[in-house]
Amino acid sequence: MKYIYTVFLLVTIVACKSNLEEIKPTLVTEKTPHDTDDPAIWINKKNPEESIIFGTDKDEVNGGVYAFDLDGKIILEKSLTKVSYPNNVDVEYGFVLNDSTTTDILVFTEREKHQIRVYSIPDMKPLDKGGFQVFEDENNVEMKRPMGVSIYKNPENGNISAIVSRKSGPSDGYLYQYAFVSDSLGVHSNLIRKFGKFSGEKEIEAIVVDDALGFVYYSDESVGIRKYHASPKKGNAEISIFGGEHFKRDIEGIAIATYQGDRGFLIVSDQQDHSFNFFSRSTNSFVKKLNLGTLETDGCDVTTEALGSKYPNGLFVSMNDEQDFFFHALDSLKIAK
């Protein structure tokens, strides 16, 4: 009976896929053991062909953040396992340690331990003494469970902070922002602000930061995409909410394809339509919808930088609800700069 139900469910999902012409992936990664959710692209500046795609795999006991090479193969020695429900992941470049050396970092939410984790890349060493607790001032356990995370590097001073969302939260102050600082005692995480409105419907998971333009966007899943200033110094007032009318139901993962100046696109998963909506980076106006073949996409990431001969003009990565991730050469999306 369970087999029949599973087949019925898969047939139903396929039948409900977007009727847009499908753009086939360049490749599909190896499968993870449990439940994929969110990817992040780390660019190896010295050798782009050795760049790594990190992807979360959710499980309360044996979850992981898996590292993939550009052929979609799992790199076991760079993967983190036995993680308690890793949800979303992001990367940043040039975090300054106490001795003035710098390292790239990987940050992910560990939902069941109510914390975020910080690792150096590419050596994959923990910098957080086991994790930084988040939403500590909340009494409700549900409001302590982190989901989304995105990193902001202030282009003016190089300071790095993480913006974190959660499974449940209030109508205002849903997101917390934590600054990462390093001193002789190690790396620390300091709460610097609470901000962000919530409709009260569904939840907030997906977050993305446009470092260069100084904005943070997040998906209030049932109503629209909310936009704020990424720097606390510019205040907590909402700039806009947009795009909700272009989604079938859940508004999910967000990625930003950045080109020179303010050109580029916000790419947002329309989860139940199994498609992606594109919005102008400069005006946030709707541009187009694409079907990239994925099912029930949660998270996605994109880079417009060249990653060797296979992805000379960039790469788009999206989670697929079959324990894997899809890689699309950015050329195949046919988005004009």
Tell what function each PLM region has.
Residues 26-64:
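Beta-strand-rich domains and repeat architectures in extracellular enzymes and scaffolds
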Residues 29-33, 79-82, 137-142, 195-201, ...:
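Surface loop/turn motifs at the tips and blade-to-blade linkers of beta-strand repeat domains
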Residues 35-49, 87-102, 145-160, 201-214, ...:
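Structural signature of eukaryotic scaffold interfaces centered on beta-propeller domains
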Residues 44-46, 70-73, 95-97, 118-128, ...:
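Short loop/turn segments immediately following beta-strands, especially the blade-tip
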Residues 70-114:
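Blade-loop segments of beta-propeller domains
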Residues 112-159, 165:
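Asp-box/WD-like beta-propeller blade repeats and closely related beta-sheet repeat scaffolds
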Residues 241-253, 283-307:
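Conserved blade-ending motifs and adjacent loop-strand segments that build the rim/top face
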Residues 246-286:
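Loop/turn-rich, solvent-exposed surfaces of beta-rich toroidal or solenoidal domains
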